[in-house]
Curated annotation (Swiss-Prot):
A GO MF label: RNA binding
Family statement: Belongs to the intron maturase 2 family. MatK subfamily.
First and last residue of the signal peptide: none
GO biological process, one term: mRNA processing
Gene source species: Panax ginseng
Subcellular location: Plastid, Chloroplast
Entry keyword Transferase: no
Protein name: Maturase K
Pfam families: Intron_maturas2, MatK_N
Organism domain of life: Eukaryota
Role, per record: Usually encoded in the trnK tRNA gene intron. Probably assists in splicing its own and other chloroplast group II introns.
Length: 503
């Protein structure tokens, strides 16, 4: 019991990070800008134009205004007094929030780096890939029976997010600045335009706050999981495990000291796996329905009693994995039964053995993907290709390059699909949409345009993935064709593309 209590006690000896002076450093904003260029660029090449507005001159002007304290009046109610944000309010606010997100990430990065070094993990780049979750599911989920699909609740009050960072960052000035950003978009956590504006314009800060909030409750869950399971967490522990908890965990210490062993007996499960993606998580187990209901009540009580988050039991669904598909990151994944028959013979007697095993299957959901294409104006809601009117002012090569880029990214991201027919249909829609866009630009019909220039004009970017496989296996074209039909998971995909993100 003393070991458990030491684990849950608050340790603040390594949390004295004073980050506010970094707000006035120019290189912080340069780092934030480079991160935005490399990571958050849209697959559709359509952005808000922030890249064009960034310059060191604007950064110097921004820092000069912040040094003038009489101009730094953080009042969102009186527009006459708010001279700091009156001119270029959106640009300055976005630049400060992005720079602030880079600064607040420093304590988390230091903690993660020390954790990786202590556990002897030199490189963790592959763990960042979105596709790394699918080989894990392919290896584990086929042996499990039940799965909890959990819709993670979000804080209903902004101060909860501030309190989450309070024990990571011992800097009152930084926390006050964080409160200003949150209250400037006071309704960011509600489904309205203000919330959408905050999450889109301040993605890095938004994801940092959200992930730090998730880290709080997952750290407790992983602690319980490690104590109640014979299997120790490895990679997930590296990324999520944390020993710093805030004050209300002291109440949990008393509870665990009194009834810790009883609680663990109720949640005992030697085969249990947990995966989180976006705002959902999956808890897969080989246990019984009774055990899964116990975990459901545990999550609901943990959120409501210790994190003050209201969550109804209906947000957690118990499903049998072999007859239910999981909507995960643009894929429909399931562990379907794969029947097989084995013929055996013993002396003069022959017999047949029916054997059915669970096989992990991942397919591309065609209907949501067509909906994303229709929203992006590549087709209508029925999937009929249309021209992209906003691109008709571009040159022919630029139009083909943009369509080709989208098609290659979709092929790259959905390479793990076990059924390629849906992906071929998406390629056909993009190909015909590209032809219609070019024909509209030249005021011609698609048939006349392709007849004049040749149908091979649009072939190059639809066969890019096959060409890569042929270069990889030059002596065995049949092997490369079989490989192309199989699932391929890439470990260099660190962001989900816009069209696959139907959520």
């Amino acid at each position: 019991m003393e070991e458990f209590q030491r684990y849950l006690e608050l340790d603040r000896s390594q949390q004295h990070y004073f980050l506010y002076p970094l707000i006035f450093q120019e290189y912080i904003y340069a780092l934030a800008h480079d991160h935005g260029l490399n990571i958050n660029r849209s697959i559709l090449l359509e952005n808000a134009g922030y890249d064009n507005k960034f310059s060191l001159l604007i950064v110097k002007r921004l820092i000069a205004r912040m040094y003038q304290q009489n101009h730094l009046i953080l009042s969102t109610n009186d527009s006459n007094q708010n001279r700091f944000l009156r001119r270029n309010k959106n640009l300055y606010s976005q630049m400060i929030s992005e720079g602030f997100a880079v600064i607040v990430e420093i304590p988390f990065y230091l903690q993660l780096k020390s954790s990786l070094e202590s556990k002897g993990i030199v490189k963790s780049h592959n763990l960042r890939s979105i596709h790394s979750i699918f080989p894990f599911l392919e290896d584990k989920i086929s042996h499990l029976i039940y799965g909890l699909e959990i819709l993670i609740p979000y804080p209903v009050h902004l101060e909860i997010l501030v309190q989450t960072l309070r024990y990571w960052v011992k800097d009152a000035s930084s926390l006050h600045l964080l409160r200003f950003f949150l209250h400037e978009y006071c309704n960011w956590n509600t489904p309205n335009k203000a919330g959408s504006s905050f999450s889109k314009r301040n993605q890095r800060l938004f994801f940092l706050l959200y992930n730090s909030h998730l880290c709080e409750y997952e750290s407790i869950f992983i602690f319980l999981r490690n104590q109640s399971s014979h299997l120790r967490s490895t990679s997930s522990g590296t990324l999520l495990e944390r020993i710093y908890f805030y004050g209300k965990i002291k109440y949990l210490v008393k509870v665990f000291v009194k009834a810790f062993q009883v609680n663990l007996l109720l949640l005992k499960d030697p085969f249990m796996h947990y995966v989180r993606y976006q705002g959902k998580s999956i808890l897969a187990s080989k246990g019984t329905p009774f055990l899964m209901k116990k975990w459901t009540y545990y999550f609901v009580n943990l959120w409501q009693c210790h994190f003050y988050l209201w969550s109804q039991p209906g947000r957690i669904c118990i499903n049998q994995l072999y007859n239910h598909s999981l909507d995960i990151l643009g894929y429909l994944s399931s562990a379907r039964l794969n029947p097989s028959m084995v013929r055996g013979q013993m002396l003069e007697n022959s017999f047949l053995i029916d054997n059915a095993i669970n096989k992990f299957d991942a397919i591309v959901p065609i209907i949501p993907l067509i909906g994303s294409l229709a929203k992006a104006k590549f087709c209508n809601v029925l999937g009929h290709p249309i021209s992209k009117a906003v691109w008709t002012d571009l040159s022919d090569s630029d139009i083909i390059d943009q369509f080709g880029r989208i098609c290659r990214n979709l092929s790259h991201y959905h390479s793990g699909s076990s059924q390629k027919k849906s992906l071929y249909r998406i390629k056909y829609i993009l190909r015909l949409s590209c032809a219609r866009t070019l024909a509209r630009k030249h005021k011609s019909t698609v048939r006349a345009f392709l007849k004049r220039l040749g149908s091979g004009l649009l072939e190059e970017f639809f066969t890019a993935e096959e060409q890569v496989l042929y270069l990889t296996f030059p002596r065995a074209s049949s092997a490369s064709q079989r490989l192309y039909r199989r699932r391929i998971w890439y470990l260099d995909i660190i962001c989900i593309n816009d069209l696959a993100n139907h959520e």
